[in-house]
Amino acid sequence: MKIALGCDHIVTDTKMRVSEFLKSKGHEVIDVGTYDFTRTHYPIFGKKVGEQVVSGNADLGVCICGTGVGINNAVNKVPGVRSALVRDMTSALYAKEELNANVIGFGGRIIGELLMCDIIDAFINAEYKPTEENKKLIAKIKHLETSNADQADPHFFDEFLEKWDRGEYHD
């Protein structure tokens, strides 16, 4: 299976270990960054993971930032993504089996790497269980999506990157 994997600068080391875990399980990893500890902005990498999944380049996605909240909010803004921020197995399985989630998000400073890898493995191996109720719920969620043509612009985040470069954001 192809898994898109992205993170911010706070948890690059965690992402690399998750990547190694996924590869050891025979999965192909599409690493969309970030690749080092240079300060960056998490929405960029949430967006990249979401785009890989929605385009079909990846089967599923994994997003990690310090708490998981920011990157998971960002990836959920990509039309077609259904991502769940999880800290436990039950939530991850519910997201996949009932809501057909295609991305899973984690707080790398909140959850341990071993548990994270166990949850990712279970999420990948779980199957969506379509029911009429689930289908209707997913349709209602999808109806909430609105497309914003500006998101396709590769310079969409330039304003924020320039602020990072000027030191206007702090960890």
Swiss-Prot record:
EC number: 5.3.1.26
Domain of life: Bacteria
Isomerase found in the keyword field: yes
Pathway given in the UniProt record: Carbohydrate metabolism; D-galactose 6-phosphate degradation; D-tagatose 6-phosphate from D-galactose 6-phosphate: step 1/1
Listed GO MF terms: galactose-6-phosphate isomerase activity; ribose-5-phosphate isomerase activity
An individual GO BP term: lactose catabolic process via tagatose-6-phosphate
Catalytic activity: aldehydo-D-galactose 6-phosphate = keto-D-tagatose 6-phosphate
Keyword line: Isomerase, Lactose metabolism
Cysteine-cysteine disulfides: none
Family, as annotated: Belongs to the LacAB/RpiB family.
Self-association and partners: Heteromultimeric protein consisting of LacA and LacB.
NCBIfam families, sorted: lacB, PRK05571.1, PRK08622.1, PRK12615.1, rpiB_lacA_lacB
Name this protein carries in UniProt: Galactose-6-phosphate isomerase subunit LacB
Organism lineage string: Bacteria, Bacillati, Bacillota, Bacilli, Bacillales
Name of the coding gene: lacB
